[in-house]
Amino acid sequence: MSVLGQAARITQNQSSIYITFDDGPHPSVTPAVCEILREHSALATFFQIGRFAKEYPSISRQCQLDGHAIGNHTFDHPNLQDRAGEEVEYQISSAQKCLEHICGRGFVRHFRAPYGAWSTQILNVVNKIGLRPVSWSVDPRDWEAPRIENLINEILDNARPGSIILLHDGCPPDEAAMWDVRGGRAQTLAALRYVVPALQARGFALQPLP
């Protein structure tokens, strides 16, 4: 399935599910996510904000060393639908240069638009840079800090072969004031500890995006 040209579900491998994390890297959350995944030999994809990757390059490198994929999530996380063409290109290309400097040329192959806000202009830039646009098919809205059991149920009730699950290991720069109010992704980490083995028990392999 795709929406405006971006992948929302992967159909090639029916035994896999793809957990993705937006808005990192974050110094307290991203390493904790990696530790949970490592404990279960699970892999994921991290859509990282360029300015945070520049600030915490060692975390991005560790994600890469652990076998995870890293995707482009712009440099500052603006809503690109509201921006002129030059700003759209700057946000995507600047993040790409930053991430390639950390991870190596050719490693970052996917792009996700902030807020899932796509346009033909955005897709044109993404295609020009050579990235694959990616959306999601399961969104438990963990950024709203729901109850842990609700977060778990939303993921497990909607997970299907090829599902792309959206979670967050950070927050956009302009939403930092809400970080502590919303629990600093504590609910996401708690849910992840349950969801990862539960999905594996159903026979799914948790893989990075192809």
UniProtKB/Swiss-Prot annotation:
GO terms for cellular component: cytoplasm; membrane. Keywords: Cytoplasm, Hydrolase, Metal-binding, Nodulation. Pfam families: Polysacc_deac_1. Its main location: cytoplasm. Residues 15-207 form the NodB homology domain. It is an enzyme of class 3 (hydrolase). GO terms for biological process: carbohydrate metabolic process. It comes from the Bacteria. It is found in: Cytoplasm. InterPro entries: Glyco_hydro/deAcase_b/a-brl, NODB_dom, Nodulat_NodB, Polysacc_deacetylase_ArnD. The keyword Secreted does not apply. The record marks 142 as: Raises pKa of active site His. Gene3D superfamilies: Glycoside hydrolase/deacetylase. Belongs to the polysaccharide deacetylase family. Is involved in generating a small heat-stable compound (Nod), an acylated oligomer of N-acetylglucosamine, that stimulates mitosis in various plant protoplasts. This is Chitooligosaccharide deacetylase. It comes from Azorhizobium caulinodans (strain ATCC 43989 / DSM 5975 / JCM 20966 / LMG 6465 / NBRC 14845 / NCIMB 13405 / ORS 571). The lineage of its organism: Bacteria, Pseudomonadati, Pseudomonadota, Alphaproteobacteria, Hyphomicrobiales. The gene is nodB.
